[in-house]
Amino acid sequence: MKKLLTSVGISAVLLSATSLQTVAAHSDHDVHNECEVALNYDVTVEPKKLIVSEVGDEKYRIEMDKLFVNGKQISLNSEQQALVSQYSQEVSAQVPEVIALVNDAVEMASTAVSLALTPLLGDSAGAKIDEMMAGLEERIESVAYQHGDKFYLGSTESSLEDAFGEEFEQEMEELVQNSLGSMMMNLGAQMMSGDGDSFEQKMDSFSQKMDSIGEEIELQMEQQADDIEARGEKLCERFKTLVVLEQQLRDEIPELAKYPLVETANTTLLE
């Protein structure tokens, strides 16, 4: 691509990248440095029911404080019963919070992309941006969703990462490439309408305007990212408690020993 087109493309992507990197830096800090937690199985939370499954195959469920493993009810003593009840309550409380956090992160990403690219690509690109973000939301929906009072969280941590991965990056690249004509017209118009008499003065004015837009977007995203980070920190602490509780549960109930739900970076609970 010629130098001018490259510069234009970089200008467009940098605004969105700056915002998204601000989001990622905040939201990933605790996840990757302190709280790397993944799920080995799918989790479904319904009123008075917790189901742990693998691609639709139920491994165990806790229903009305009763434990069923592979469809068979397990007899529990009082100590085991207390652990099962506590574990069910903790998982049932945390899964909806994780899903809410994911949805807020997606909404924040959508806002960042729209704020960054619409001024450059023009209003005509708005529909394409909406379509791209709808595709992202659809991919997220397949691994983390709420339908009424039913909550579902997919098994692998990578599923959420994939939603923001290569396919999303490719869609954004295609959006920019397909809108280069409109983008150059918008940029040219904004450059020529800038303050100053000479071309250099207009370029300086345009550069300052772009910097101002970028800083404004980054500020908006950073404020939202701070909130998500704070919520993530609280969830992290609760997940640490859940890891210990689940290990106790699996130690006390042999039927659950081979179904570790939680996996951490430092300790893999699969045996």
Language model regions located:
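Gram-negative bacterial Sec-dependent N-terminal signal peptides
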Residues: 1-24
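General N-terminal targeting signals
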Residues: 18, 22, 67, 77-79, ...
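N-terminal Sec/ER secretory leader and immediately downstream segment
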Residues: 23-135
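Short, surface-exposed, charge-dense and proline/glycine-enriched linear segments
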Residues: 108-111, 125-148, 183-187, 250-267
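A cross-kingdom marker for long, charged
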Residues: 204-271
